[in-house]
Amino acid sequence: MAKKPVTPASKVAAKQAAVRSRHQEDVFTLDPLIDPIFQKGELRSYLVTEPSPSVLKKRSIHTKEYWMLSSLLLIAFYVRMYNLSNPNSVVFDEVHFGGFARKYILGTFFMDVHPPLAKMLFGAVGAIGGFKGDFEFKSIGDKFPDSTPYIFMRQFPALLGVGTVILCYLTLRQSGVRPIIAYITTFLLIIENSNVTISRYILLDSPLIFFIAAAIYAWKKFEIQIPFTFGWYRSLLATGIALGLALSSKWVGLFTVAWVGFLCIYQLWFLIGDLSVSTKKIWGHFFARGIILLGVPIALYLGFFAIHFQLLNKEGDGGAFMSSAFRAGLQGNKIPRDITEQVGLGSVVTIRHVDTQGGYLHSHEHFYQTGSKQQQITLYPHLDSNNKWLIEPYNGTIHNETFVPLINGMKIRLKHINTGRRLHSHDEKPPVSERDWQKECSCYGYDGFAGDANDDWVVEIVNYRSQKGEAQTFVKAINTIFRLRHAMTGHYLFSSEVKLPEWGFGQQEVTSASQGKRALTHWYIETNENSILPPSEAKIINYPKLSLWQKVVESHKRMWKINQGLTSHHHWQSSPSEWPLLLRGINYWNKEHKQVYLLGNAVTWWAATLSIITFGTYVLVTVFRWHLGTPLSTNKHVFNFNVQTFSYVLGWALHYLPFFIMGRQLFLHHYLPALYFGILALGHFFEIFTGYLTSRSKYFQQVAFVLVGLFSILSLVFYVNYSSLIYGTPWTKASCELTKPFSGWDYNCGTFFDTLGEYDIQEKSLASESEIPTETVVVEAKQTPKAEPKLAKQDDHIESPAAAEPVEEKEVKEEVEQLAPPLAVDFEEETPKVEDPQVADVDASSNDEKSVEEKQQQEQQQEQEQVEDESVHQVQQ
């Protein structure tokens, strides 16, 4: 039989038909997997690790998939952008991160527990939107003025939330999931309530999860590239960049870096066992991954901190957490300048503690209520005349003829300028600390008293912390770190974070100690005046300019300290053990009979948790059977399921389990990065369930797809039923009560009206109120007090608040509470306004006596009013 001639037209038609067939197969029945290749070795078979070129082709996005991606994009855009203008007031941590964006625009320095990138991005978006920093984001429920582009600022995290959705789909495709399953799983992420909520407000979670999702996608793309090709290096570099962005947004990004690191080790182990890979290539893998995956994130992290310091170049409330050397580089600082370097007998100095931010060695005309009941010695954070001490010889008077420098090993006395008493220690129990190795320090003496041996202190220079050279022999202002050893007891002048009670005005306790952290006995001289030293011989110095690395190190010490201090109870905090089961939510906003409450989509949430538990059980059973001699399956579907699901479960564990060892306040939103890994793992369970496990029967596969579809519908129903808590839209009490199966879901149904019609009445009432003309007063923008440490109580000689410097630091526990998430207001009540810290705590020690007099006057007035009331009552009778 003669063959029909093949014409060019028939070739084109056949090619087009093949393309059409391939595209249809790609979308609906495409198998993105290939069989793993095993080769025989001398002792056992080994896995060939180099990906086949066909894998990249099978898992690339095909033409018809763009329609699927477009639909996901539109749905995600609508879900996350819907009604962003509501609420039109501050929600939850917008208090902090909106306030931080404001400070980037104003350039005022602040301190936060998170790296700067996400906050800088919000600041940049605000600046692009025309925000001038005239709104403070002071309290939850504060209404945004027209001048604040809060909708524009909220659009940024919403867009990143949309981007996370697209990355989820692409990641699942790169890890071997069919398009239809990737579509369904991504749809679950779109309608996951907690992810929708956090992507609608000025919060760090949406940027963080987006960067983590980008790192996961880039890594999965990297895994299927042929080693040392352009695509391989490009994907590896993209992974490093995404890791750097995540790490620079929140320290949770460290867990993502650890995840990639573990997978690198895991893959290198198989590379070593692959006999087809040369030793040279193994070293190439090691160095390429190490340099790019560590070097790029570190470079980005430091670079963003450099930009952070450049932008925040003005003195602000955050300076109170930093050292004087750091603050000296900020514009508008009041750190002492032009200091005489040479310190000697007769110098009037201020002595600053090194390793706490308690401030200066200080005394005042107030006395301990325990122990010796002598004059108090404290650390005080303000510049103040009560910080000044005269350096005296221990055994005589000061000779005004010649300057005697202060040197290592010299015995001296320190005389308090304002009260004339000397720094003193003895065998008395400290006022607060109860350790037996600490003794009381006081100020002791009186007119005409020459002092005693308990006033004697020996100067010991700490060479390794002092500037090299003369500062290691002679005590130099700023440049010499020293200890003061009590000559009689051998104890060292010591201070920690312990605070004195109210009678000590909350100032930091100073004791002498024979043990404890050595660094807590380190001091330096900040200001120095000496009339004996000829002006021509005086060397004038200032704080040296800190390098970027020094600023980064100091900032991280403060960030870590503040983070560790977030230990006080918060009403909406929760335990990590509660997160996988979604036992607790967070009240974000509550006003005008509406509420925003962070709650996950329980259907998706519990399914992700179940998939994690199921995979863990499956691994244990498989390993047990393998030990009994059952070989591991090399079926391509099972093999890919094992490898990919293991990587996602590992990511879930690394982003979840570390929270169990953290002592700080924790909240449900801390679980969201782990949840993202759980959803990716859930997608692979859908894949194995609708594919391999039901592949023997088309009917069973159809049933499997129906079950997955019903699961998606159930998740959608949950999203719709609880959407009022996402968007802060009207709801009724009755509808709300039907949605509370657990006591931990403690959103307040009493917030809502009984009927939806009441909201229309409320809207009309609010609209009529807004039409009433009001005078707008433009005031100078203030620094948000939410990040400010409270002022320590000030001494009675200060005449006005303006005379006091901003406090360096309050007790860590109290300071960091200012950085903790605020409580959402209930109903229409406003959160109490924070008093101006420059006014609230002024002159507390002198006000104690005044407060007693005022109290007595109030009591007398109340008694007089009571008498008058009784008289009136008798007349009426």
Curated annotation (Swiss-Prot):
Induction: Transcript levels are increased at least twofold by tunicamycin and Congo red. Both MSB2 and CEK1 are required to down-regulate PMT1 transcript levels in cells with intact glycostructures. The lineage of its organism: Eukaryota, Fungi, Dikarya, Ascomycota, Saccharomycotina. This is Dolichyl-phosphate-mannose--protein mannosyltransferase 1. Belongs to the glycosyltransferase 39 family. CDD domains: beta-trefoil_MIR_PMT1-like. Pathway: Protein modification; protein glycosylation. Residues 783-799, 807-816, 847-857 have a biased composition (Basic and acidic residues). It holds the Pfam family MIR. It is found in: Endoplasmic reticulum membrane. It comes from Candida albicans (strain SC5314 / ATCC MYA-2876). Keywords: Endoplasmic reticulum, Glycoprotein, Glycosyltransferase, Membrane, Repeat, Transferase, Transmembrane, Transmembrane helix. The gene is PMT1.
